[in-house]
Amino acid sequence: GNIVYSDGFYKNAYNAKKVGTEKGAGLRWTTQWQISRTVTADNTAAFNYSQNGGYEYEYVGSGIINYNDTCFYRRNTVRDALTVKWRARHFTLSSITSFQHITDNLTLDQDFLPLSYFTLTQAIHESSLTQDIVARGKAGFYTWLGGLFGFYKTTRMRAPVTLKDDGIATLITDRVNNNDKIPVMIGFDNPEIPLQSYFRMPTWGV
């Protein structure tokens, strides 16, 4: 296993908190079985976690890291692989089955200002399953190799952009209400406008 930690090198002037922090951990475990004289199995499982707190991004106009909304990146990964081998008299047959699941979340104060313009989130859930079957002839005057491979992967992504009160005022209401050619005044009861987007992307092959 392993553990990673860093408390960052820069501070956000808005709240005096450090940005660029990092923490994570990983664990890997392998188990082997001698099922019989000719059959063996090997399983490896792994888990990894990492989280970064904020980003050392600054607005070019000020040259200062100074933003008010939450920023972070978080990722979890689970992997497992099972290998089973059968050693026959004239060939070896192997089955390799693997599974992986990833969840990550990237959330940004997209304007990187101490004002509430808009934020972005990109959250991904991805699962994949693979199966590999390999037959291999034993050494002799000649040898041979054959196999079959298949996989399935599905990715679900949620990527909302949230327009916040300063962004609503600057981009929408002020432009309309200060335009003499538009005979109406507009306003929003909700200080936030979420613009939702969702994607599902399955992939498979043999």
PLM regions and their residue ranges:
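Face-selective signature of the C-terminal outer-membrane beta-barrel domain
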Residues: 40-46, 77-104, 120-206
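Periplasmic-side early beta-strands and strand-to-turn transitions of outer-membrane beta-barrels
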Residues: 1-71, 75, 102-116, 123
